[in-house]
Amino acid sequence: MKTAVLAALLFTSTLTIGTVAAQPAPYNEIGVTMGHWHIISKDVEANKKLFLGMGGKLFMPGGNPLMMFPGIYINLNLGTEKGDGGTQGSVVNHVGFIVDNVQERVAQWKAAGVPVLPGNNNRLDQAFVETPDGVRIEILEDKTQSMPIRHEHVHFFLPEAELPKAQAWYAKTFGGEAGTRNNAPVVDVPGGQLRFAKADTKQAPTRGRVLDHIGFDVRDHQAVVKKIEAEGITLDEPVRKSPTTGNTVTYITDPWGTRIEIIERAPLGALVQ
């Protein structure tokens, strides 16, 4: 896990120096870093208020609301589409942040109007936040980190026989480092960890749900697309450049139903809030 540890240290040092918050973690060797969660909000303003209350920063690239936390962007709309169905019951069961002190952050968030659920079995080092339209966010604690909050993980729920296959697929496709956490398979990528847990029943694909897809930012879109196509992965749609944001994007879908955006991101513009 030396690569993942080094990336985490570089990421932390970049943020503690106080440089612009709107930066993902440094790219890995193939030019990939954790990118975003794309929420198709039924109530954009409610979600904006929630994430601002948790310490997020708001940008408006191309006139679209984009929240930023260390290690992750969160898109709050997708044109005129509205998602149906929360994360639970889909292959991406939940996503996660890690904070320096759960109880202190929970108190601050509640004061800002963020609804917070207790941890499992009333654990004091864990909590949950759920968006108004059902995106479940796990909150964990690392008292050694120097920032109040950062992105930590995306948690996939899959049939047991598929767990090693999914781990291998994500490690190969995005240049991640395979490992284990609590005896469960994981893949470390800059800016976050992909975790894989057993589901007793087949879970629904993400497309069309409130968390419609996850995304990876890339340094060289053409090179990454060439790599994954050579590995037999078919693009869901042709590569295109957004006329409003300047981003270069395409989508793929993993073998288990997670929609994934691959994006080379243009500058975000000024911080709004």
Whereabouts are the PLM-identified features?
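Eukaryotic phosphotyrosine signaling hubs
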Residues: 34, 91-94, 153, 210-213
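Bacterial N-terminal signal peptides
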Residues: 5-18
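Mature N-terminal segment immediately following signal peptide/propeptide cleavage
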Residues: 27-62
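Solenoidal tandem-repeat scaffolds enriched in leucines and small polar residues
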Residues: 162-183
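Vicinal oxygen chelate
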Residues: 21-30, 106, 110-158, 179-181, ...
